[in-house]
Swiss-Prot record:
Disulfide bonds, paired cysteine numbers: none
Pfam families reported in the protein's UniProt record: DUF480
Annotated organism of origin: Acidovorax ebreus (strain TPSY)
Name under which the protein is recorded: UPF0502 protein Dtpsy_2730
Family named by the database record: Belongs to the UPF0502 family.
Coiled-coil region list: none
């Protein structure tokens, strides 16, 4: 049976762990699946995260164990260190494009369709905003037998040009305009998105280098310092 957020919504740590696995599978495929240490670093990174979290290793491990019970993540046995990968598309029953949008919403919070298209550049290249909106509409109109809607369109905040979308994987969201009153204009969002992409690209390069060093250490049988 598909994942149903209405009866068993994700916790905040579960959503962060799952979304981080989704992100890294697309942005740093050479270092994926992730070790627990790499996953912890990805969950707690400061760029491309809203809110920024400071999860502990035990909290990440607990989230992994809980997600594994729901078949949303899989543990891959390694030579020395266990690695983890998501099973999101099959577990939730959505295509890759929808998985990318949901992952971004879990990592960065509510976003407009335009912001999602910009932020998804390294996840999936959508042809235009209309294609993003088409997948969002599909997620919003998801039937009950498939687990119900997975996103909702929030009311447009005062001063904002466009309404924002939010995911429902953690249950219903507070759609009050007060919560979203700080929404920035589209031009500012594009600038912030471009900067965040550059920072994310650098962090992904560092993560890939760390993963390479870790695998070399595993092959040589030496401890990583």
């Amino acid at each position: 049976m598909p994942f149903d957020a209405r009866t068993r919504p994700l916790t905040a740590p579960q959503a962060r762990v799952l979304a981080t696995l989704l992100e890294k599978s697309r942005t740093v495929p050479d270092s994926y699946p992730l070790t627990l240490n790499s996953l912890l670093a990805g969950c707690n990174q400061k760029s491309s995260r809203d809110p920024v979290m400071q999860l502990t290793e035990s909290e990440v491990q607990q989230a992994l164990d809980e997600l594994r019970q729901q078949t949303l993540v899989l543990e891959i046995g390694g030579a020395r260190v266990a690695r983890w990968e998501h099973n999101f598309t099959r577990g939730v029953g959505v295509p890759d494009q929808s998985a990318a949008l949901l992952g971004l919403l879990m990592l960065r919070g509510p976003q407009t369709a335009g912001e999602l298209r910009i932020n998804a550049e390294r996840w999936h290249r959508f042809a235009d905003i209309s294609s993003v909106e088409a997948f969002l509409d599909e997620l919003q109109s998801r039937s009950d037998d498939k687990g119900g809607p997975l996103v909702t369109l929030l009311p447009r905040a005062p001063g904002a040009r466009e309404p924002r979308w939010a995911h429902l994987l953690c249950g219903p969201v507070d759609a009050s305009p007060v919560q979203m009153a700080s929404a920035s204009p589209a031009s500012r969002s594009e600038e912030d998105g471009a900067l965040a992409q550059r920072v994310q690209a650098l962090e992904d390069e560092v993560a890939a280098l760390r993963a390479t060093v870790q695998r070399l250490c595993e092959q040589l049988g030496v401890a990583e310092h």
